[in-house]
Amino acid sequence: MTFRPITTSFVMCFFLAALANAASPAAAQTAPLNPRVAIKLGAIGAVSDAGIFIAQEKGYFTDEGLDVELVSFKAAPQILPAIATGEVQVSGSAVTPALFNAFARGIGMKLVADKGQVAKGFGFAAIVIRSDLTDAVKDFKDLRGRKFAVMGKGVSSTAQLGKALELGGIEPSEVEFVELGLPEMVAALGNKAIDGATLLEPFITLATARNVAVRWKGMEDFLPFTGQNGVIIYSQKFAEEQGEAAKRWMVAYLKGTHAYLDAVTSGVDRDGINAILARHTAVKDVSLLRRIAPTGFDPNGRLEIKSLEADQDWFLKLGLQQGHADLSRVIDYQYLDYAVSRLGKR
């Protein structure tokens, strides 16, 4: 066999090809943004904000060239005005009539990703019944005439209770709704002031541990679709004027939700993830975080449109929403598509 010496021209061609590859668009995509972009991000401190808090603490936003400042809101109604006025560029939000009304009125916002779903294995929302009523309430029809505590008629968990009432052939007017905060619901179950409640974790676990209620039905047990309980919204100005930053934000956020899902399904860094949640959410007891049903997330960030439309139907039926919002005009998946192209589809 004859070996030929490698010529200088061959080496030069190889070197130039390597340089061209290093400067390719794919390589440039993953370099941090320069200059860095500052983003104000709204959150209320719910466990469903897990992807946000994990991305912040693990440096995923920083890796993308983003300087993210968390802005804390005490209640969901504060979020939409903050997005509309530009106080924050990105925020999580509950699914409410106010959200749909804002979309219907054309307020500058985009619906861009999932932020919390009720699905099989992720039953963080449930209908609970007082412990002493378990023999009396066995079927959906047995909900007629009962007094239920809800966070409000205009929230997704109450719309999901509405689906349970439908299964029992019950109109909303045939039950009594009492609006209470989640901690107050547990107390009301204990003193028998209510018959049942729509609870979220960790209050489901707390109520059952105190034996004041039983988990009657998880929302995932009867909904004909995955329940969409939270969403991510971008201000339209941010999305249009800082499009590259909007894409990079989504990469970091989706990495955060993946880290959460890996922790709760496979135990990957479970203690570390729980420690992050304990620092940022109302659930400060790490041992409680280990026991509660986890929040669900679509691993590719997609929204459950059927759930959002069902919520709209409920809000319109109760006169809580002014007009139907055309979701096809406000949902924008280009940022998720970019993130999935970077991280891979799950």
Task: Spell out what each predicted region is.
Residues 20-30:
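Signal peptide processing junction and immediate N-terminal pro/mature segment
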Residues 312-346:
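Conserved C-terminal helix/tail region of periplasmic/extracytoplasmic solute-binding proteins
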Residues 184-277:
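Pocket-lining segment of extracytoplasmic ligand-binding domains
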Residues 63, 116-120, 221-223, 297-304:
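Short, solvent-exposed loop/beta-turn-alpha elements that line the ligand-binding surface or hinge
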Residues 1-5:
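N-terminal secretory signal peptides that target proteins for export/translocation
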Residues 9-21:
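Bacterial N-terminal signal peptides
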Residues 240-322:
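Secondary-structure end/capping motifs
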Residues 29-170, 176-179, 195-201, 217:
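Short, glycine-/small- and polar/acidic-enriched structural segments
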